[in-house]
């Protein structure tokens, strides 16, 4: 059974969808940002299905946006779960602040190159920097390769690397 656990974010997009895969190993797909309200909602969602964070055995990260990966380190520490992500995301997650800073610099440079006024580009970068502490370094125990497989007792998922929404 795959269960939807909606987790609130402070972003205009609203909730992020996290998924609990009730199989062996017990797996959570995406985490929400590292905020108290997000963690509380995730814990409540797990409890609705008779689970708690400490029961998690695997965490799968779909891409590096903070609303999808922010709680990964906290959940991995509390549960001891294996963390899986597409291979290009592994070094990014293991150097959180360095990576997110580089993304912000790239975004600001891109805006400036395309004619966005400096004060607006700087304002966007400042806003983005305010989110940096909503995630932190986490070791990716299992980098996933495009076309590879993620095994469960009752199913196998094919890994598909489809960048576009994010670089990873």
Task: Give short role names for the model-derived ranges.
Residues 1-49, 55, 98:
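Conserved beta-strand hairpin/beta-sheet module of binuclear metal-dependent hydrolase folds
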Residues 14, 37, 47-152:
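Active-site HxH/HxHxD metal-binding segment of metal-dependent hydrolases
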Residues 1-3, 82, 142, 156-158:
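Conserved beta-strand segments of alpha/beta enzyme cores
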Residues 20, 147-168:
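Core dinuclear metal-dependent hydrolase active-site scaffold
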Residues 33-35, 66, 164, 168:
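Short, glycine/acidic-enriched loop or turn micro-motifs at the edges of active sites
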Residues 27, 67, 91, 157, ...:
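Glycine-centered loop/turn positions within well-structured domains
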Residues 21, 30, 42, 63, ...:
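Divalent metal-coordination and catalytic microenvironments
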Residues 4, 28, 143, 149, ...:
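Conserved beta-strand positions that form and line the central face of beta-propeller blades
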């Amino acid at each position: 059974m795959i269960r939807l656990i909606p987790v609130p974010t402070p972003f205009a997009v609203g909730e992020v969808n996290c998924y609990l895969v009730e199989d062996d190993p017990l797996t959570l797909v995406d985490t929400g940002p590292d905020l108290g309200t997000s963690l509380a909602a995730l814990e409540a969602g797990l409890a609705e299905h008779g689970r708690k964070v400490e029961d998690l055995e695997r965490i799968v990260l779909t891409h590096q946006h903070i609303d999808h990966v922010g709680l990964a380190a906290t959940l991995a520490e509390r549960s001891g779960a294996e963390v899986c992500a597409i291979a290009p995301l592994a070094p990014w997650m293991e150097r959180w602040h360095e990576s997110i800073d580089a993304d912000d610099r790239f975004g600001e440079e891109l805006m400036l190159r395309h004619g966005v006024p400096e004060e607006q580009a700087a304002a966007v970068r400042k806003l983005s920097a305010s989110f940096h502490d909503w995630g932190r370094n986490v070791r990716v125990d299992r980098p996933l390769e495009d076309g590879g497989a993620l095994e469960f007792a009752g199913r196998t998922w094919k890994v598909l690397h489809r960048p576009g929404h994010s670089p990873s």
